[in-house]
UniProtKB/Swiss-Prot annotation:
Belongs to the aldo/keto reductase family. The record marks K87 as: Lowers pKa of active site Tyr. One of its GO terms (cellular component) is cytoplasm. Substrate binds at H120. GO terms for molecular function: oxidoreductase activity. PROSITE patterns: ALDOKETO_REDUCTASE_1 (PS00798), ALDOKETO_REDUCTASE_2 (PS00062), ALDOKETO_REDUCTASE_3 (PS00063). The active site is at Y58 (proton donor). This is Aldo-keto reductase family 1 member C8. Its main location: cytoplasm. The keyword Protein biosynthesis does not apply. It is found in: Cytoplasm.
Amino acid sequence: MMTDLKQSHSVRLNDGPFMPVLGFGTYAPDHTPKSQAAEATKVAIDVGFRHIDSAYLYQNEEEVGQAIWEKIADGTVKREEIFYTIKLWATFFRAELVHPALERSLKKLGPDYVDLFIIHVPFAMKPGKELLPKDASGEIILETVELCDTWEALEKCKEAGLTRSIGVSNFNHKLLELILNKPGLKYKPTCNQVECHPYLNQSKLLEFCKSKDIVLVAYSALGSQRDPQWVDPDCPHLLEEPILKSIAKKHSGSPGQVALRYQLQRGVVVLAKSFSQERIKENFQIFDFELTPEDMKAIDGLNRNLRYDKLQFAANHPYFPFSEEY
């Protein structure tokens, strides 16, 4: 993926559509009122975001969809200007559950198609109504579903016109190869959405994805929201990093803007997540400055392979993605 950031704010996916290089993430911890997701999405569209990232797991698809439709109804945007992503959750990986899961999400959202439908994590969980099905001892119940079967079901969703593109999330290079080497593959993943920030810069995975014409999409690009359900609260705060602060000062910006701009200049599509009106505006203002090669090198040097979202509960699953180097 290469794009001239001065000329274009989007990148062409390997199956044709364009994806805006800066997206708005809609995940929020359980204690956040769902109405905030709707309000924040409307603010994001007002300030210029056209790439909206949601998921069944976030349990706010209806609110986010409603916000998008309100902005279409008031003339701020047209549907074709919005790039909307949703994700297949781990309890729906069996092939026969994929199409109904997407249709359910579409019903909540209102549109008759999404722009991108991605496998949220590579490991499956026991099907059912629970987001995180647990056994009597409180352990999450995982199951093994062949990823290639799930992928084939996504291909059928694309062929049925329910989604324009299909992709994956939280895959390592070996899991990507599993899909890429699938006999009878019709469509390869357009993207791999992973945790990516200066403390975990994913340089090897980025090179691998570029070599396969797969776009790397960064989540937790500003560090993490530190939801205790997923993240160790003792992890260092990325935006307190002195090197990011000094580079930000030089460019009259914020550490968050530097962290986002860093990804764009590496050829990574980046998601920014905030429910604060001021921060949403600030996060969009990353197209009017450029980091120098020295800045980029200094930020590269911050990598410490620090993963905020470890998904440790799935460590023994055969498709657990984080036991490989990349």
